[in-house]
Each structure stands twice: as structure tokens, then as C-alpha cells.
Amino acid sequence: MSEKKLEKFQILGKKLEHQGRILDFYSYEMLVPNGNHTRWDVIEHKGAAAVVPVDQEGKIILVRQYRGAIDDFLLEIPAGGRDSTEEDFAVCAARELEEEIGYRCENLCHLVDYHSAAAYTSEKIGIYYAENLIPATQHLDENEFVQIERYTLPELVELIARGEITDGKTIAAIMAYKVLRGK
């Protein structure tokens, strides 16, 4: 069996359909390798950062918060969008750590990068872990409400296995932390 090399697709044009506060919705005109023209719906996003905060007892701090798109609460690691496409992912992760759970850290280490849904969005999430947490002041946005919860790594793996954690970035982060940190 011969392996055929994939050919690159070409973006011929982009039409802004909606500009939002957090994301922009585009219609891309594409030229595919067989010569056909097609349209793709694409959400362009500045990117985000997320952090696995590990407290002095080795517990991981998560937030439970409401997500309107699914009309339910999700258990997630602290995360948030970058202020611009130029903002360093680590700077964003450190900011979200303080804003959402009220901690700074001495050690912020990169775990993995994650494309949240590459079929239709450019969003890339830089995922970090934070150790040696230092108490600071929580700075939630005006319309942001979270409940802080702490779990051991085995408890989180069990919650993932039982389908009680369904947030993709959180699943990727916890499993990457488990594998890469040898826990």
C-alpha cells in the first residue's frame, strides 16, 4: 500500500460575518486539492491559557462555573482568553490563576498546547501547571461566578472516567499532568 502525501488547502479569501467581543466568525473561501472551491465556517479566536494549580497538600484546585452554551455547570481548571494574539500564554495563565482562584505561583510550567476544536476554530490553549502557590486576591469579572473545589489527582482521573468532567481542556490538562509529571 502506498502512502499518498496530503496536499495543502488554500484559503482564497475571508469574509467577516460577525465580530464579537471574544471571537470573530468568518466565512472562508477554500480551494481544496482536487481543484474544487468550497466555503468553510471558521471562528477566529485570540487563544487562551489554562492552568492546573497544585496546592501545598498536592490537591488540584478547580472551579465549577455556569456555561451558557450547554446551560449547565462544568468543573474546570482556571482558564481564560488572551487579551491579544500577542499576549504570552504564560502571562495569561498567571493572570487567570489569580483572577479565578486568588493565587499567584512561584513555578508556572508549560504542560501542553491544545486546539479546542480545530475543525471550526483557530483557538489554541496553552496549558500550564502551577506549584508553590501564594495566596493573592481573587478578581472575578463582574458577571463571573465560580465555586472553588479541590481534588487529588486520582479523584480527578476517576471523575473523568465516570464522565463527570466533560470539559475538553480540563481532561487534556489533567491527563497531561498525570503523564508528564509522573503522578
What are these regions (language model features)?
Residues 24-28, 73, 124-126:
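Short beta-strand micro-motifs in enzyme catalytic cores
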Residues 9, 13-50, 56:
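Acidic, metal-coordinating catalytic segment for phosphate/diphosphate chemistry
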